[in-house]
Amino acid sequence: MKFVALALTLLLALGSQANLFQADAPTQLEHYKAAALVYLNQVKDQAEKALDNLDGTDYEQYKLQLSESLTKLQEYAQTTSQALTPYAETISTQLMENTKQLRERVMTDVEDLRSKLEPHRAELYTALQKHIDEYREKLEPVFQEYSALNRQNAEQLRAKLEPLMDDIRKAFESNIEETKSKVVPMVEAVRTKLTERLEDLRTMAAPYAEEYKEQLVKAVEEAREKIAPHTQDLQTRMEPYMENVRTTFAQMYETIAKAIQA
């Protein structure tokens, strides 16, 4: 309706300036008036299409009143536009006076129709909100129960596994130390035995040191070279065993730790 009032205002303004436009550019004046009338026709057509979408007997009277008001408004605008040029000021005033009540009636009908439709829109929104709230009330306890059960199960599993993890960690450390305590003495014993044999050999060779110094030194070095590989071989053979034990316990610990965190 604001656009309808704008079109009427344009017609009035063009009418009040008719003499000036006729003196300067009469074709431009006619173009503006024709455009305003075309716009009023479009407004009437669009309003009638909108009214057709209102169903029910409650709105029939409003549809009829509003349609009649738009038709009369269009007729007034058409008649006044044709008479504006020779009688600009008189017809402009007459148009405003003659259409005042009609324009007020149109605005009243539109506001009345809006007030009739507003409760239905509010009722629809209220009904939808009610259904949403009902669904939320029904689903929320289920979600809460499911979430609580998951948390409870996770806490129970964690409570059961934590002592087990501590035992495994302690057992792992204990097994490593136990294995080391058994293997290291064996290596040390072999090393001690070999060292003793070398010392015995050196003691036995001492009296002949000066006489057979060069030969004895050479013999001792040869003996050392022969014994050293056996010592290194023993250590090499034991190292994979130690590493295998360490890797096995580490993998076991990591697997259980991941299961708890999951």
UniProtKB/Swiss-Prot annotation:
Residues 1-18 form the signal peptide. It comes from the Eukaryota. The keyword DNA-binding does not apply. It is found in: Secreted. Keywords: Cholesterol metabolism, HDL, Lipid metabolism, Lipid transport, Repeat, Secreted, Signal, Steroid metabolism, Sterol metabolism, Transport. GO terms for biological process: acylglycerol homeostasis; cholesterol efflux; cholesterol metabolic process; lipoprotein metabolic process; phospholipid efflux. Disulfide bonds: none annotated. The keyword Transport applies. GO terms for cellular component: chylomicron; extracellular region; extracellular vesicle; high-density lipoprotein particle; low-density lipoprotein particle; very-low-density lipoprotein particle. Sequence repeats lie at residues 64-85, 87-107, 108-118, 119-140, 141-162, 163-184, 185-206, 207-228, 229-239, 240-262. Homodimer. Interacts with naxe and yjefn3. Participates in the reverse transport of cholesterol from tissues to the liver for excretion by promoting cholesterol efflux from tissues and by acting as a cofactor for the lecithin cholesterol acyltransferase (LCAT). Belongs to the apolipoprotein A1/A4/E family. This is Apolipoprotein A-Ia. It comes from Danio rerio. The lineage of its organism: Eukaryota, Metazoa, Chordata, Craniata, Vertebrata. The gene is apoa1a.
